[in-house]
């Protein structure tokens, strides 16, 4: 069975939504939402508006990762899904395919330099990562070459996919965007198509960690090695992509840093076997189903009452090592007031 429900713009248009979703103006889940605890998820996706979320500050790691993905995709992709003038996702022919790699890297590096650092530490990262982007990109090209991506057709990037209730049993769709899908061309009765790719690739970049201040006042940095095993959250993301194609397409998870690349697949990672992917997809659905049940208990109330009653049942985990970082002091105070801790 091929799970093809091409999502171009808004999951809201895919099917009827439950009452709580309509009242709270939510229409989908995503692997990113899985990766944060319930309390942080509730605040970011039910309290903050989409505009407020988009206004949250980025950091140098995120911007550098975007730069690397852009370089790899612009050089290799046949098609890149992008938002058009009316905020509608559309597959567009890549006009920069096979353009000189170094030229693309220089252009993306210049765009990265436009990032406005959040603080002194982020500024130090910004300066450091400018020196690392070239190496990370080159390792990315090497990894993709090893997988034979460059010689396959078609290569599609940033395709938005949606898993609906028929597959997940959730009220809301689960939405994601693939870094790369490649291959799978078929010819039938003279018509060439690629209904199912030959492979799915998810790329994760790693950047040197900030160390202690030197006597000179400069920041020291610690180089990272590729992980011995993938991040659980990254495997969840891969499982979502695999489920979309009914686990018929192999998934490759690539880690890149300035020193090396590492490719995980079903041969060296249990989480990327069919059984592992199915298990992780089930785990993701379980988390989202819990959140739906929490909200549905109060769906006959008004939106603010739904939020307040749900908050009373959730630990905000303000001590979490990263999920409340970068949310801004004003929003953090707002969240703590919501949970009555200040």
Q: Which residues fall in each region the model found?
A:
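Metal-dependent nuclease catalytic cores that hydrolyze phosphodiester bonds in DNA/RNA
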Residues: 1-192
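Conserved catalytic cores of phosphodiester-cleaving nucleases, focusing on short active-site segments
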Residues: 68-69, 176-225, 241
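A structural signal for short, well-ordered beta-strand segments and their strand-loop junctions
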Residues: 156, 182, 199-203, 250-255
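Short, solvent-exposed loop/turn segments at secondary-structure junctions
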Residues: 162-164, 206-208, 257-260
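Short, mixed charged/polar active-site loops
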Residues: 171-175, 194-200, 261-263, 267-269
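Metal-dependent nuclease catalytic regions and adjoining charged, substrate-binding loops involved
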Residues: 213, 228-232, 243-342
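A short acidic, glycine-rich active-site loop
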Residues: 221-235
């Amino acid at each position: 069975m091929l799970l093809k429900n091409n999502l171009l713009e808004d999951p809201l248009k895919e099917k009827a939504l439950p009452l709580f979703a309509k009242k709270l103006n939510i229409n989908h889940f995503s692997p990113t939402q899985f990766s944060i605890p319930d309390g942080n998820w509730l605040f970011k996706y039910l309290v903050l508006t989409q505009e407020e979320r988009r206004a949250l500050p980025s950091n140098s790691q995120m911007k550098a990762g975007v730069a690397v993905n852009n370089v790899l995709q612009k050089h290799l992709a046949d098609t890149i899904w992008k938002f058009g003038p009316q905020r509608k996702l559309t597959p567009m022919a890549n006009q920069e395919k096979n353009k000189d790699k170094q030229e693309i890297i220089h252009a993306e590096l210049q765009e990265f330099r436009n990032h406005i650092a959040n603080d002194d530490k982020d500024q130090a990262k910004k300066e450091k990562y400018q020196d690392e982007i070239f190496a990370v990109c080159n390792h990315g090209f090497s990894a993709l070459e090893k997988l034979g991506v460059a010689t396959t057709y078609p290569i599609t990037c940033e395709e938005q996919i949606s898993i609906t209730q028929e597959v997940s049993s959730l009220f809301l769709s689960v939405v994601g965007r693939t870094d790369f899908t490649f291959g799978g061309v078929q010819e039938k009765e003279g018509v060439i198509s690629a209904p199912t790719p030959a492979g799915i690739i998810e790329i994760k970049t790693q950047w040197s960690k900030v160390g202690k201040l030197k006597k000179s006042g400069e920041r020291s940095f610690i180089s990272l090695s590729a992980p011995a095993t993938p991040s659980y959250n990254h495997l969840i993301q891969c499982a979502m992509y695999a489920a979309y194609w009914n686990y018929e397409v192999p998934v490759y998870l690539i880690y890149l840093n300035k020193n090396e690349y590492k490719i995980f697949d079903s041969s060296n990672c249990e989480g990327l076997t069919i059984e592992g992917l199915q298990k992780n997809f089930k785990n993701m659905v379980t988390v989202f189903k819990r959140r739906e049940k929490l909200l549905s208990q109060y769906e006959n109330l008004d939106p603010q009452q739904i939020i307040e009653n749900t908050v009373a049942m959730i630990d905000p985990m303000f001590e979490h090592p990263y999920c409340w970082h970068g949310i801004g002091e004003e929003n953090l105070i707002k969240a703590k007031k919501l949970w009555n801790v200040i």
